[in-house]
From Swiss-Prot:
Its EC number is 4.1.1.23. The keyword Membrane does not apply. Coiled coil: none annotated. It comes from Bacillus thuringiensis subsp. konkukian (strain 97-27). This is Orotidine 5'-phosphate decarboxylase. The lineage of its organism: Bacteria, Bacillati, Bacillota, Bacilli, Bacillales. It catalyses: orotidine 5'-phosphate + H(+) = UMP + CO2. The gene is pyrF. It comes from the Bacteria. GO terms for cellular component: cytosol.
Length: 238
């Protein structure tokens, strides 16, 4: 189950990544590479991480016209990443095009990357969604709508809050992948995310994967913090 614990490499460049990963010599991680790091270092950072034996969630949240997304996904699949994502708000045609691009670009003999969609960012509150985005639904209804559309479009799952997982299991079934960021240890600050949970709570609510950033990357001892999160996520009593 440790491979369903994703560590967010929210760093500005490769030097910071190298320094962080020194704490994990010999440990094969599942890491998330986001916009900041990928836009700075480009595909070379993916090659570097793959050579180290790590699995990669390339978190670029594509949202564009279908043809552009298809072409972009073809390129991303050729990098041999393990997971990618789009914004569900891009619509069904765009999401279907994403899958087509991944199938065309995947390396020979390998499965395409897992493809998930963002429903609502964990920084989005219901008030913000209604007043600023203009969606006149409850947050739960909006997330469920996007999740259902995602499944119908052939994607593997969604990025969502842990709090939304039980409802999505009802709507989309137990095989539908739920990747949940906003994970913090109980002692941590929540920072800029509104809908957060502990690893233990994420496990109880049925998340497929959890994404953990600052609780590990900003810890005085990242390896020990990783082990603590892993134990809580796996339900290990120490």
């Amino acid at each position: 189950m440790s491979q369903s614990l994703i560590v967010a490499l929210d760093f500005p460049g490769k030097q910071d990544v190298e320094q962080f990963l020194r704490h994990f010599e010999g440990e094969e991680l599942f890491v998330k590479v986001g916009m900041e790091l990928f836009y700075k270092e480009g595909p070379a950072i993916i090659t570097y991480l793959k050579e180290k034996g790590h699995k990669i969630f390339l978190d670029l949240k594509l949202h564009d016209i279908p043809n552009t997304v298809k072409s972009a996904m073809r390129s991303l699949a050729s990098l041999d990443v393990d997971m990618v994502n789009v914004h569900a708000a891009g619509g069904s045609s765009m999401m279907k095009a994403a899958i087509e691009g991944l199938e065309e670009g995947k390396q020979e003999g390998k499965e395409r990357p897992i493809c998930i969609a963002v429903t609502q960012l964990t920084s989005t509150s219901e008030t913000m969604m209604k007043k600023e985005i203009g969606i006149e639904k409850t947050l739960e209804e909006a997330v469920a709508h996007y999740a259902k559309l995602t499944k119908e479009s052939g994607l593997d799952g969604v990025v969502c809050s842990t709090l939304e997982v039980p409802k999505l299991r009802e709507v989309c079934g137990n095989e539908f992948v739920t990747v949940t960021p906003g994970i913090r240890l109980a002692s941590d600050d929540v920072n800029d995310q509104v809908r957060v949970a502990t690893p233990k709570r994420a496990r109880e609510l049925g998340s497929s994967y959890i994404v953990v950033g600052r609780s590990i990357t900003k810890a005085e001892n990242p390896l020990e913090a990783y082990k603590t999160v892993k134990q809580q996520w796996e339900g290990v009593t120490v």
